[in-house]
């Protein structure tokens, strides 16, 4: 078959093998359309875009079979359910846009997965290797929302998740190496932690003393949960749990490590945590002058 494949408005059921030489995409689900991929394999020699694309208002249900050979396994701007099977792409295995909702119960997505909309994961396996997101197997982009209660991220249970949006973690049915949390990322724990989670925090442009990891969905982090959270930070930073705000915050241990005072600003003030302040306040203050000297000042 050569061309643009199927543009579908109503209900289409696929349960046969499809071999493709050159195609832009196999299936495009238009608003109001529904495709049920019950089984069969879709093998492409040269798919220039994706195997299937779901527009806003379209529905795709993928149950079994293997699809491969495209730059993308799928693009989703509608509603997608993945129950099983294998989906792969050379750039991304899958990509969910801002209007899309993808729910994954099982199966395997190979080549990396990008979420810019809403993705709910209770099972399945995610494998990297695509050119789109480098060493990561899952990328939750800025503005994206991901809920993970199950699934394996990486070929042997170890893989890296990037979070630049909102990430909800619950249950103990998921496995990965660590989460890399970007400056705009927020992580919400929505249930008791039964496994250790490892999180790298990117402190570039991050707002210090602002909760980064919190309880969510009416769940409050407990002391036992905190023991199961390992946070990896660059030198000069530390973290602590702020019970009054129900979350983990990042603070500077040096405060003035990389701060330069110019000639027009003779003195800079910092509180004990290293946060810049406009003037001296009660308690311990750190003062840095333009000649490079620092001193501690206690105000009673």
Q: Locations of the language-model features?
A:
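Residue-level detector of functionally pivotal "anchor" positions at catalytic/ligand-binding pockets or at interdomain
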Residues: 251-273
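All-beta strand scaffolds that present successive hydrophobic residues in beta-strands
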Residues: 12-15, 20, 31, 35-38, ...
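Hydrophobic alpha-helical segments, especially N-terminal targeting/anchoring helices
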Residues: 29, 54, 241-243, 270, ...
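Glycine-rich beta-solenoid repeat tracts in large extracellular/virion proteins
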Residues: 4-8, 21, 25-30, 43-45, ...
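A glycine-anchored, Pro-Gly-centered beta-turn/N-cap motif
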Residues: 281-285
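C-terminal tail/sorting-segment detector
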Residues: 286-300
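Extracellular/surface-exposed low-complexity segments
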Residues: 151, 170-174, 181-253
């Amino acid at each position: 078959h050569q061309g643009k494949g199927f543009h579908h408005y109503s209900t289409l059921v696929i349960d046969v093998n499809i071999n493709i030489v050159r195609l832009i995409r196999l299936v495009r689900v238009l608003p109001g359309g529904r495709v049920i991929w019950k089984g069969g394999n879709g093998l492409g020699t040269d798919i220039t875009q994706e195997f299937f694309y779901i527009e806003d208002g379209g529905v795709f249900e993928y149950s079994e079979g293997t699809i491969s050979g495209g730059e993308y396994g799928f693009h989703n701007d509608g509603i997608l359910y993945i129950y099983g099977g294998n989906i792969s792409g050379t750039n991304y295995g899958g990509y969910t846009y801002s209007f899309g909702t993808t729910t994954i119960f099982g199966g395997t997505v190979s080549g990396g997965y990008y979420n810019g909309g809403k993705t709910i994961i209770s099972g399945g396996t995610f494998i990297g290797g695509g050119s789109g997101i480098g060493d990561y197997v899952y990328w939750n982009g800025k503005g994206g929302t991901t809920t993970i209660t199950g699934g394996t991220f990486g070929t042997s249970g170890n893989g890296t998740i990037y979070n630049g949006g909102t990430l909800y973690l619950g249950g103990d049915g998921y496995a990965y190496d660590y989460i890399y949390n970007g400056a705009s990322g927020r992580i919400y724990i929505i249930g008791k932690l039964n496994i250790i989670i490892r999180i790298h925090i990117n402190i570039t442009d991050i707002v210090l003393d602002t909760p980064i990891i919190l309880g969510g969905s009416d769940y409050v982090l407990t002391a036992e949960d905190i023991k199961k959270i390992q946070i990896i930070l660059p030198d000069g930073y530390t973290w602590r749990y702020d019970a009054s705000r129900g979350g983990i915050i990042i603070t500077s241990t040096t405060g003035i490590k990389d701060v330069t005072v110019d000639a027009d600003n003779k003195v800079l003030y910092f509180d004990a945590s290293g946060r810049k302040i406009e003037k001296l306040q009660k308690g311990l203050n750190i003062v840095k002058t333009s000649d490079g000297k620092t001193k501690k000042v206690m105000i009673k």
